[in-house]
Amino acid sequence: MFASAYTLKKKNFVRHISYILGLGVLGTIVAMTVLTLILNYGNELYRDPVTGESWVDPAECMLLAAVLASTDTVAVLTLITADKYLVLNAVLFGEGVVNDAVTILLYQAVDREIQKAEAATNHGIEDGAPGHKDITLGRKEISGMIINFFSLSIRSIIMGALVGLLVSYVLKVFNLNYDPIKETTIMIMFAYLSYLFAEQTALSGIISMFSCGLFMAHYAYWNISKKARVGTEMAVCTIANCNQSFLYIYMGLSAFSIEMEYVHMNMVYTTLIAIFVCRIFSVGVPIFLVWLSTGMKPLQLKWNEWVFVYCGGLIRGAIAFGLGLQMTTDNNKVLKNTVQICALVTIVGVGAPI
């Protein structure tokens, strides 16, 4: 996330901001909504008629939807060049960056509300209420989730911005141009500090680091020597690529650790269908609104390029896999295995043909 923010081509990002924010913000929320509806429908449809048990609790369907709202456009971006497909490249890259940030915030907002609901339910059981009770999120909880989402977003962005401005000021005052290695070290160190500060104050460390990267690229970048500029960019990109490579290797190896006793195949099939269906809405709804807002002018992308956008958004990669591992709900093993299988199927089944 930091590398994406630090190396972001701001001119292209701003020029196509309506498409990027439409797909990255509104599209992600639409995808989560559609996924939640389909998963809840499947959860009730395949409920055991004898025991009355379902795959997971209704609230966990929303948590799973928040995780699977994440997209991974890496496979598509490797096939197109920025020179030949300038708009398409900018839209896909921008959507990927914004989608990652929004997905993480949605996941954290839903997870916090579920933890509160679970705590209240467990407290009721201790007081003598009947055994297991489905965890659901009503209007009050959903309202709290929305407030939490915006509150967490704003505070995390401010935290990252403050750290980014601080390192910019430090580099300007102390003027370390004579030592590019120290400049690069300070840049990377403060980027990680923005993550630590946010995590210690119950904010989103990843969003804080993303915000820090944007401010460092805009301010701190110009307060360091030319050698440090090149070195810092190469360092963060190398670290990011290594991390992503190791994560994909781990994802591949994790296929052998899937616990089949916690896999509901009907749930997996329903989830995969939901991923394909939700992408239609997460692309169609934002683009239709952008088209209306521009006075129904022709779109900047051709129909075949929109097919690339659709296909790129079908893959569930590093963010979805990472968030899936963090789940701590009662049925977390079922959810984790479902995310693992969906990630592997979309990477191999969609990414490989692309």
Go through each PLM region and give its residues.
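Transmembrane helical cores of multi-pass secondary ion antiporters/exchangers
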Residues: 1-354
